[in-house]
Amino acid sequence: MATYSSNDFRSGLKIIFESEPYAIESSEFVKPGKGQAFARVKMRRLLTGSRVEKTFKSTDSLEGADVVDTNMNYLYNDGEFYHFMHPETFEQHQVEEKTVGDSAKWLQDNAECIVTLWDGRPITVLPPNFIEAEITDTDPGLKGDTAGTGGKPATLSTGAVVKVPLFVQIGEVVRVDTRSGEYVSRVK
C-alpha cells in the first residue's frame, strides 16, 4: 500500500494509524514562526466511528489503508450474523451484529447497502439513503387533534420507530430517510 506524508493528508484519505483504519475528515497544515511545521488532523476511526484529533510532524508518514466501499445486497439475519452478497460476483459476507449496529433497523430483504471492507473483512454497513416500509403499528389519528407537534410515533415493518403525520394509518407504506430517521412521504 502507498505511504502518505503528513503534507499529503487530504479529506477522505483512508490511512492506517496504530494498526487500525482511519478516514481523514480534515487536515490543516500549520507552519509556526518558530519551530517545526506540523499537520493538525481530524480523523474518524472506521471500526468504531469515534472521532480523533491528532497532530503529526511534517516529517511523519503513514500507510494507506486497504479499505474498499462495496455495494452489496442484504440477504438475511440468522440471529448471529447478517448476510450480504455482492450482486456481480455473488460472493457472500457474514457481518457481526455489533458491526451492523444501528443500521439493522433499516435493513430490508435485497436492499442495496454499502459495506466497507478492510483486508476483505466487513467493518461498517450503510443502509440505503431511503427505504419504503409498511407501518405495522401506530395510534389512530383523531380528527381535530392538531394541538402539539402534529406527529405520532409509528412502528415500521423493519422494527424502526419513526414520527409520522397524524393522517398516516396502519398498513400504509411510507418513505423514510435512514440518515436522519425522518418520515419523507407516503408511497402510493
From Swiss-Prot:
Post-translational modification: May be beta-lysylated on the epsilon-amino group of Lys-34 by the combined action of EpmA and EpmB, and then hydroxylated on the C5 position of the same residue by EpmC (if this protein is present). Lysylation is critical for the stimulatory effect of EF-P on peptide-bond formation. The lysylation moiety may extend toward the peptidyltransferase center and stabilize the terminal 3-CCA end of the tRNA. Hydroxylation of the C5 position on Lys-34 may allow additional potential stabilizing hydrogen-bond interactions with the P-tRNA.
Residues the record lists as N6-(3,6-diaminohexanoyl)-5-hydroxylysine modifications: K34
Any single GO CC term annotated in Swiss-Prot or TrEMBL for this entry: cytoplasm
UniProt xrefs under SUPFAM superfamilies: Nucleic acid-binding proteins, Translation proteins SH3-like domain
Pathway: Protein biosynthesis; polypeptide chain elongation
TM regions (residue ranges): none
GO biological process: peptide biosynthetic process
Annotated localization: Cytoplasm
Coiled-coil region(s): none
One GO MF term attached to the UniProt entry: translation elongation factor activity
PANTHER family recorded: ELONGATION FACTOR P, ELONGATION FACTOR P (EF-P) FAMILY PROTEIN
Function description: Involved in peptide bond synthesis. Alleviates ribosome stalling that occurs when 3 or more consecutive Pro residues or the sequence PPG is present in a protein, possibly by augmenting the peptidyl transferase activity of the ribosome. Modification of Lys-34 is required for alleviation.
Stated family: Belongs to the elongation factor P family.
Protein name (database record): Elongation factor P
Gene: efp
